Amino acid sequence: IPVALRQLQLISQHATQQANGFFAGRLARLWQDIHWGSLLFLSPLWPIALTHPQLLEEWELRVIHKGESARKVEKQLFGVRLLDICLALVDIWRLPIWVQQGYRLLLNEQRELVKVLRIARDSDHPLRQQNRLDDDPTLRRWLNQPANTVLLANGLALSAQQSWDGPHSQRWQFLTGLYLQISMDEVQQQLHQQAANSAR
């Protein structure tokens, strides 16, 4: 098995553990949707990792480590955005609807994501966060969609692969804290606890 595929499958398992730890208990009746959506979210990348692992390795090197524009690198390596490939495969394979919603959000709802992230970063002032969400009920509904758990779990798992305390990882931690209405300390404590549990 190519390293890139093994790495993606480990990230998918990690995402499932994060989803179960953070969300399954709170949304018990949706446990299966959360579990399978989290596990299968990155599956559209598995065939590329199996047949052309060097492309994903080059993407990781250039985008993650060197900070090049993802859009530009993906155009050169794949001819289209990687998210477009993933969404097309999600549709063809008829993967769970929450997986589809996650990719659609990343492709088409970036404005909402940025707004929510701005609110999430204000984690030291939960009352102010609450007021800002109360002032924008449409954004609150958008944030509170159960399908977002799949994206949050994969965001946490993917970013942890790069760095536990890097800016990318913190973004997903802030968003998870806002979604669950818990502090960053609680998010980080749960992250480390779940990492320790999965290492056993």
Residue ranges and their predicted role:
Residues 5-37:
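Alpha-helical phosphate/pyrophosphate-handling elements in metalloenzyme active cores
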